[in-house]
Curated annotation (Swiss-Prot):
Family of this protein: Belongs to the HrcA family.
Gene name per UniProt: hrcA
Pfam families, A to Z: HrcA (PF01628), HTH_DeoR (PF08220)
Keywords for the protein's UniProt record, in alphabetical order: Repressor, Stress response, Transcription, Transcription regulation
Name of protein: Heat-inducible transcription repressor HrcA
Role according to the record: Negative regulator of class I heat shock genes (grpE-dnaK-dnaJ and groELS operons). Prevents heat-shock induction of these operons.
GO biological process: negative regulation of DNA-templated transcription
Domain of life from the UniProt record: Bacteria
Gene Ontology molecular function terms on file: DNA binding; DNA-binding transcription factor activity
């Protein structure tokens, strides 16, 4: 028996089941696909696929449906992804080009991804720890108060206010010098790599001005240390309701898992590691978790397709985005959509 032919039979079963939601029988395969073999041979191939755990027979039907293992083989053997149409690409570009700031970009992206995939879309905000500093601005306010503004390459803006004793407020020349030195050592560098340079800055200033420099350094370090920076946005939850027949028991565990941001953040973090392996094997950096590959019990009947975005290289993502839906998913189209949106989002943030 040909392993390649058996794979073609599995591909046909996956495509038909995704398209029709109906278990697939040998007669349907003969009628819909030019497999070039007899119905008896197809039945034998289906029996072998079932014995190997790639397809299964639901209790109520004589047809077969793909298992998580079957979907995994189907995804792993995808050689190409269907590209988006020129009209779809133009629509994505136009939508993101109109965004006015980072929040608007992220909001437009998550809604767009949900719309074109008909799944739940999730977009992680760019992590401050993985972004590059574009510029630091120091803005004197009231006496003894200074606003520190950090602008990242992703468009993210972090602001912190420093309170100083009125008699310890620096003069304009000191503020200007610190601003210049901060940008000289920091602009164009990843935020976590500023540590040594920041520690050296006070040595360039008079002892009387060093408490001020230390205070600025402290708020920059504080911004990096904050755990609250990791957050996500989500859209398209209603799409799950349209797929409720794909969840044999109940959709409630999925909805409950989606309500827990920590679950989704952990999942995206795990998929970031998956993407490193996928990038070396398939070259596209698209990570796919299928069914029970998801460690959270509430997501055991779902699949997640994710990709990194931002950064100057494929392995330099500043955050991740993805979609979640039933395992009965159009994987090639969904993977292509996630890849395309991630690329356009990267360009939009790169400005």
């Amino acid at each position: 028996m040909s392993d390649e032919r058996r794979l073609e039979v599995l591909r046909a079963i996956v495509r038909d089941y995704v398209s029709t939601r109906e278990p697939v029988g040998s007669r349907a395969l003969v009628e819909r696909h030019a497999l070039g073999v007899s119905p008896a041979t197809i039945r034998n191939d289906m029996a072998a696929l079932e014995e190997s755990g790639y397809i299964a027979q639901p209790h109520t039907s004589a047809g077969r449906v793909p298992t998580d293992k079957g979907y995994r083989l189907f995804v792993d053997r995808l050689s190409t992804l269907k590209p988006l149409t020129p009209a779809e690409r133009r629509a994505i570009e136009h939508l993101l080009d109109e965004a006015v700031d980072l929040d608007d970009v992220v909001d437009r992206t998550v809604r767009l991804l949900a719309q074109i995939t008909h799944q739940v879309a999730v977009v992680q905000y760019p992590s401050l720890r993985r972004t590059t500093l574009r510029h630091i601005e120091l803005v004197p306010m009231a006496p003894g108060r200074l606003l520190v503004v950090m602008i990242m390459d992703t468009g993210r803006v972090e602001q912190r206010t420093i309170e100083l004793a009125a008699d310890a407020a620096p003069d304009e020349a000191v503020v200007a010098e610190l601003r210049a030195r901060l940008n000289a050592v920091g602009a164009g560098r990843r935020m976590p790599r500023l540590g040594v340079e920041l520690e050296m800055l006070p040595t360039y200033f008079a002892p009387a001005d060093r408490p001020f420099v230390d205070a600025v350094n402290a708020v920059i370090a504080e911004a990096l240390a904050e755990e609250t920076e990791e957050r996500i946005v989500m859209a398209g939850t209603a799409n799950l309701a349209r797929s409720d027949t794909d969840f044999p028991r109940t959709i409630s565990p999925v909805l409950e898992a989606l309500e827990e941001q920590v679950v989704l953040l952990r999942l995206l973090s795990e998929m970031a590691l998956d993407a490193e392996e996928v990038r070396s094997e398939r070259g596209d950096g698209i990570s796919v978790r299928i069914g029970h590959e998801n460690r959270h019990a509430g997501l055991a009947e779902t699949s997640i397709v994710a990709s990194g975005y931002g950064g100057v290289a494929a392995d330099d993502a500043v955050a991740y985005l993805g979609v979640l839906g039933p395992t009965r998913m159009d994987y090639p189209t969904t993977m292509a959509s996630v890849r395309a949106v991630a690329r356009y989002l990267s360009r939009a943030l790169g400005g």
